[in-house]
Amino acid sequence: MSRILLLLAVLIGATSQKEVTIKNEKCRTCNFLVSTFDEGLKKTARHHFAGGDTAWEEKNLGKYKTSETRLIEVLEGVCKKSSLPNMDNFMGIAEIEFKCSTQLEKHEETIEEFYYNQQHNNMSNWLCVEQLKLCCPDGHFGKNCEQCPGLSEKADVCFGKGSCHGDGSREGSGKCKCETGYTGNLCRYCDIEYFEESRTVQGVVCKKCHEGCLGVCSSESSKGCSKCKNGWKLTEEGCADVNECQNESACTKEHEICVNTVGSFKCECKEGYKKDDEQNCQFDVEASPDRPFMPIDQQLKLIAFSSLIIIITFVVWHGSPVLYVLTGITIVALILVDLYVNPDTIPDEAKRFLGY
C-alpha cells in the first residue's frame, strides 16, 4: 500500500513539474526602476551629506532631502544600466531600459508621491507590490498574491524542498517544483531511489540510495537495497558489484580486453590497437610506444657515422682499392642521410621497427 501511495505521489509530482516558464518581466522591470532610483538616492546623499548618521541627516539635510533639485538629479540615472554595479538580477529582459522608461513615464506621479511622502517605506514593496500591482511579496503568487504551499502551515515555501511556480509575481499556478530527490504536491515525499532519513512538521529530509539499488531503499548503504540494478547482485552484505570480466563471453572480439567498472564493464583494445568505425580493434599505426633514448633520425646518422669510421679504419689498414670505393659510397650515403633524413621522411614501418 505504501508503495502505491509513493507511486501516486511521484506521478502527481511529475505533473506539477510541467509548468510554463515565467519571465515575470513587468515585475522585474519595476524592480530595475527601483534599484536605479535607490542608487540615485544613495549617490546624491553621498555627494551632499557624508555624515552617515540618520539622526544627523534628519536634522541637517534640510529641504534638500525631498527637494525637486535632488529628484531631478536622481532621475538622471533612473532606468540606466550604467547606474548599477551589476545587472545579474535583471538578465534576460530585452530592451529593459526602454521598458523601464515606459513604466517611469506612465507612473511618474506615483513615483513622485514616493519621493515626497513615502521614503520611509520600502520602495519595491510600496511601488511594485502595493501601488502598481506588478509583483507579489516573496512566498506569494498570482493575480491576488495567494500564499505559496507551505506558508499556511507555518513552514517554508514548498516545505523548503522546492520552488513555488510564480513566486513573487502576479503570474503562475503556485505549484511546487521539487528539488532532486523530492516529489509530491508539497515536496513532502522522497522520490524513487531516495529514502526518508527524517520527517518533521517542517518537512522531510531525503537521501539518495546506494548506487547499486533498484527502486526504493531503507538506508544509504547497499544493505538498504530491496533490489539491485543490472551489474549488481544481492548478497548478505547488500548489493555487490558483479565482475563481468570473469565471464568468458565478455569482450570476445580479436585484440579486445575486458575492463570491469562499477555496475558494468567495457571492452577496450589492447595496447597498440584502436577501434575502427565498426568497433573492431585494428592495428594503430599512429600509436606512440615508449620513446627511444635517441630520436630515430639521430640513430640513423649515428649508424652512418659509425660505419664510415669502421670502413676508413679498414681502408687505412689494408690499403685496398675496393675499400676506397666503399668509403666513397659511404660518404655519399652519409651526406644524403644528413640532408634528407628526418622524422617526417621515415616510413611508419621503420619507426615501429626501431621502437619510435
Curated annotation (Swiss-Prot):
Keyword terms: Calcium, Disulfide bond, EGF-like domain, Endoplasmic reticulum, Glycoprotein, Isomerase, Membrane, Redox-active center, Repeat, Signal, Transmembrane, Transmembrane helix
Chain ranges for the short sequence motif CXXC as given in the UniProt record: 27-30
Broad enzyme group: isomerase
Residues in EGF-like domain copies: 150-188, 241-282
Residue ranges, Cytoplasmic side: 318-321
Reaction(s) the record says it catalyses: Catalyzes the rearrangement of -S-S- bonds in proteins
GO terms classed as biological process: IRE1-mediated unfolded protein response
Family membership: Belongs to the CRELD family.
UniProt protein name: Protein disulfide isomerase crld-1
Species of the source: Caenorhabditis elegans
Gene that encodes the chain: crld-1
